[in-house]
């Protein structure tokens, strides 16, 4: 049976436009979902409110204001899943967000359109990787941020496509310049779920076991948001609006109720590298991370 040319099938496909409305409560809920503490009133109290920059990742799954676990319409990664079927599972490999302007923390509307921008072939039996782009605009049509992410499909390789490029991020071979400990609570996945990522692997024990996990796991973009909050606190304290770009590989699953550590290496005046570590296992949850600011 011939293997379909996934690059020809998928590259350039765009989804229907989507939108979501939000207000200060959604901004504060997101902050709590990514670990904001009592001292972080800047993210949780409307008197001082600023948005944690990674609130701009919420449209990637985009299930806010719709029925749980239903995308209306499908985001690009899910469309790829529909075309590639039959497939057992797909896995997010990395995420990148570029900020064009700060997120309005009081209220606003996000509008966006998902697009498949590239497909990589890891070889027969090794899977394929689909890269998607989500440009998020506000109600006036101004660009707020651009999300890029890659999704791995286990059974889809061997169609003769180009290989996936290697990351150009190299963590310095020295001790970190800064470390900060934190804790992902036993209900962190449930709290983050309320921000829009209703994938069953993060809530349903039976579903998680079917996917070879002992229990539901923390959302990758929750770890991404945790890291962003901590990076802002160290590198640009009190000024989240200065964030320019953040990217990281999703390297290993994280269970609720786990101590974590952010490790940071400064590169220059406006760039740093980071890892987000599981302190129980010593493994990187997020690796090859980079954070840039204005």
Outline where the language-model segments fall:
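Short, surface-exposed helix-loop/turn micro-motifs enriched in polar/charged residues
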Residues: 43, 126, 238-242
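A short linear-motif detector with a strong N-terminal bias
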Residues: 8-9, 68-78, 90-93, 109-115, ...
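Catalytic-pocket segment enriched in acidic/His residues
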Residues: 206-283
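Hydrophobic, proline/glycine-rich low-complexity stretches
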Residues: 1-109
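Generic secondary-structure boundary/loop-capping signal
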Residues: 19, 40, 49, 55, ...
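HotDog/MaoC-like acyl-thioester-processing domains
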Residues: 2-15, 90-180, 250, 254-257, ...
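A contiguous, surface-exposed recognition patch within enzymatic or periplasmic domains that forms
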Residues: 2-48, 167-223, 230-233
């Amino acid at each position: 049976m011939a293997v379909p040319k996934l690059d020809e099938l998928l590259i350039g496909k765009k989804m229907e436009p989507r939108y979501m409305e939000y207000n200060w409560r959604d901004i504060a809920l997101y902050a709590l979902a990514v670990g904001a503490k009592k001292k972080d009133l800047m993210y949780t109290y409307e008197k001082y409110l600023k948005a944690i920059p990674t609130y701009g990742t919420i449209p990637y799954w985009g299930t806010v204001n719709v029925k749980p676990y239903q995308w209306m319409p499908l985001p690009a990664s899910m469309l790829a899943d529909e075309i590639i079927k039959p497939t057992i599972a797909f896995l997010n490999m990395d995420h990148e967000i570029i900020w064009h302007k700060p997120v309005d923390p009081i209220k606003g509307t996000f509008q966006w359109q998902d697009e498949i921008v590239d497909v990589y072939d890891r070889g027969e039996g090794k899977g394929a990787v689909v890269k998607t782009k989500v440009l998020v605009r506000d109600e006036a049509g101004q660009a707020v941020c651009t999300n890029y992410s890659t999704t791995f499909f286990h059974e889809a390789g061997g169609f003769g496509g180009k290989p996936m490029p290697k990351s150009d991020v190299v963590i310095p071979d020295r001790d970190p310049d800064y470390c900060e400990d934190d804790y992902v609570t036993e209900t962190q996945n449930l709290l983050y779920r309320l921000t829009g990522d209703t994938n069953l692997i993060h809530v349903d024990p039976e579903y998680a076991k079917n996917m070879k996990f002992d229990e539901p796991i923390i959302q990758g973009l929750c770890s991404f948001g945790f890291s962003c909050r901590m990076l802002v606190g160290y590198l640009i304290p009190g000024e989240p609006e200065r964030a320019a770009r953040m990217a990281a590989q999703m390297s290993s699953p994280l269970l609720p109720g786990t101590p974590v550590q952010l490790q940071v290496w400064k590169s220059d005046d406006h760039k740093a590298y980071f890892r987000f570590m599981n302190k129980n296992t010593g493994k990187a949850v997020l690796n090859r991370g980079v954070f840039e600011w204005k």
